[in-house]
Design a protein with these regions (language model features):
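N-terminal leader/auxiliary helical segments
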Residues: 1-94, 99-314
């Protein structure tokens, strides 16, 4: 990821990069914004017998076969019932928006994550928790910048996840289609809507960071892990900008996958991703050339070989 709030804010702006007339109703707008959460809801779908398959789907969609994934998604929209096609297209374009932000933003996040873990050997097995804390801080930063200094008290993260039964049904069909055709994973269509509901439920439970209920959950999780992932996902209530995490001082950093050197702040990475989305979504809609759409870059920002196989987490 970036995390929930940043993806939502990105969707609110990336929707304006779509060709005129693509989004024609409020429900299509909701579907597009929800699509901006990408495969991430499946990471939160722990209250299902299919938890391992759902987690695996979220992982493999992020790391591999991106061109086939989006080709299948586009094909899936073409097979929907005519009354559902526009809604499915809106969701698919939102999922593409999630991917474009991820591939631009993740090198920024991973550069910090790798540096923090390398500097403290005790964090070696806690990369996911470090990743979550960085992205939570970026959520806090972007919420303040995009919504006039707002905090998660003003905009609770769970409230940013909006859907309808119809969107869940159509999006579920598309995600099930991609899971089976591209990755050979059997995910019934109903699992997507349940995953979204579980994502909402979890954020209601853990927010805000530092609350009594969050501390209690963290203590329980601490019986199993050295550091709490759920505590890392929760957002701080603060009016102080996370300047260091967002690199607002424009220190030099290096893309860990390409070695490209930059002094961009995170807000500048966000804006660069918006420009990228405008170009990428035009290719997706007009040409269907998915190699050109993805450039064989996965959601982490790692450039893969032409077969786009990659079998490990960063």
């Amino acid at each position: 990821m970036p995390a929930l709030i940043t993806h939502h804010l990105f969707g609110e702006e990336s929707i304006d990069r779509l060709p005129q007339g693509v989004i024609t109703s409020d429900e299509e707008r909701i579907a597009f914004i929800l699509g901006n959460q990408g495969p991430d809801p499946f990471f939160f779908h722990i209250l299902t017998p299919r938890v391992s398959d759902c987690t695996l789907l979220a992982q493999v969609m992020h790391r591999s076969r991106m061109s086939r994934q989006f080709a299948c998604l586009r094909d899936g929209v073409s097979h929907l019932l005519p009354r559902d096609a526009s809604l499915g297209r809106a969701f698919a374009l939102g999922l593409l928006s999630h991917y474009v932000l991820d591939r631009n933003a993740h090198p920024f996040v991973y550069e910090q994550q790798f540096g923090i873990v390398e500097s403290d050997s005790e964090l070696e097995d806690s990369s996911s928790q470090v990743h979550a804390v960085i992205e939570s801080d970026l959520d806090v930063l972007m919420l303040q910048l995009k919504r006039d200094g707002a905090t998660v008290d003003d905009y609770p993260p769970a409230g940013e996840i909006v859907t309808t039964d119809r969107i869940n049904r159509v999006a579920g069909v598309l995600m099930s289609y991609v899971a089976g055709r591209v990755y050979g994973i059997d995910i019934p269509a109903g699992e997507y809507g349940a995953a979204v509901a579980n994502m909402q439920r979890l954020y209601r439970a853990i927010e805000p960071a530092g609350s009594a209920k969050t501390r209690a959950i963290s203590l329980v999780e601490g019986l199993v892990h050295d550091y709490s992932l759920l505590d890392g996902l929760a957002h701080r209530v603060t009016t102080e900008l996370p300047e260091r995490t967002g690199n607002l001082g424009h220190l030099t950093w290096k893309n860990p996958f390409t070695d490209e050197v930059s002094n961009e702040s995170f807000p500048e990475v966000f804006d660069r991703a918006l420009v990228d989305y405008g170009c990428t979504v035009a290719r997706f809609i007009e040409t269907g050339d998915m190699d050109a759409v993805t450039g064989h870059v996965n959601y982490s920002g790692r450039v893969l070989e032409a077969d786009e196989e990659f079998d490990r987490e960063e």
